[in-house]
């Protein structure tokens, strides 16, 4: 899943840069470093360190799904996909996230973790 997270971040940064967005550093996290997949092995080490402080938090989108409420997926990953299409940048990871969440939202359920992992593994191995 870490590889999928890094690919997702790379898509966000690449699309953002194409749209003229400059990402500000956050603490020790430098979003611009994720504009490419270079040094992915190093990123596989640093991403868990960056996420360590928030490991016990539950995402608001997950909370929405648990309550059967609409999520903000179209305004987060959906925007990345939309602008990716505008700039002819492929965004398969953000698209898959949006697809998984929208399927769960329509079914008023929470995505099955193992099924989602399998879908990301298929994308990584494509």
Language model feature labels by segment:
Residues 2-126:
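NAD(P)-dependent Rossmann-like dehydrogenase/reductase catalytic/cofactor-binding core
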């Amino acid at each position: 899943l870490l590889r999928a997270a890094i690919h997702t971040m790379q898509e966000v940064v690449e699309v953002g840069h194409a749209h003229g967005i400059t990402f500000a550093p956050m603490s020790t996290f430098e979003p611009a470093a994720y504009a490419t997949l270079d040094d992915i092995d190093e990123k596989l080490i640093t991403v868990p360190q960056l996420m360590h402080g928030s490991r016990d938090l539950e995402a608001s989108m997950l909370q929405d799904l648990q309550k059967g409420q609409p999520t903000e997926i179209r305004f987060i990953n959906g925007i990345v996909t939309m602008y990716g299409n505008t700039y002819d940048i492929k965004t398969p990871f953000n698209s898959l996230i949006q697809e998984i969440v929208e399927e769960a939202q329509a079914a008023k359920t929470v995505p099955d973790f193992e099924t989602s992992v399998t879908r990301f593994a298929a994308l990584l191995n494509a």
